[in-house]
Amino acid sequence: VPANCLLPMKVGPCRARVPRFYYNSSSGKCEGFTYGGCGANANKFQTKAQCEKACA
């Protein structure tokens, strides 16, 4: 699993409420979360398919 996929999910401080996906290293699956629009890390993908291609 690439290092960016092991980063914790990070919503960020903004309040844009953008649907995104991240790799949950505990469950081994890509899961949805609501991204605030700024201040995230590299464990953030536009689609579940992109997340799975990169991490799962």
Swiss-Prot record:
GO molecular function list: serine-type endopeptidase inhibitor activity
Subcellular location field: Secreted; Nematocyst
Domain BPTI/Kunitz inhibitor: 5-55
Keyword S-adenosyl-L-methionine belongs to the record: no
Matching SMART domains: KU (SM00131)
GO CC entries: extracellular space; nematocyst
Tissue specificity remark: Expressed by acrorhagi.
Annotated S-S bridges: 5-55, 14-38, 30-51
Site (Reactive bond for trypsin) residue list: 15-16
Keyword list, A-Z: Disulfide bond, Nematocyst, Protease inhibitor, Secreted, Serine protease inhibitor
Chief location: secreted
Family label: Belongs to the venom Kunitz-type family. Sea anemone type 2 potassium channel toxin subfamily.
Function: Serine protease inhibitor that is strongly active against trypsin (900 IU/mg) and moderately active against plasmin.
Remarks, miscellaneous: Does not inhibit potassium channels (Kv), as well as metalloproteases, and cysteine proteases (papain and bromelain).
Protein name, as recorded: PI-actitoxin-Afv2b
Organism field: Anthopleura fuscoviridis (Sea anemone)
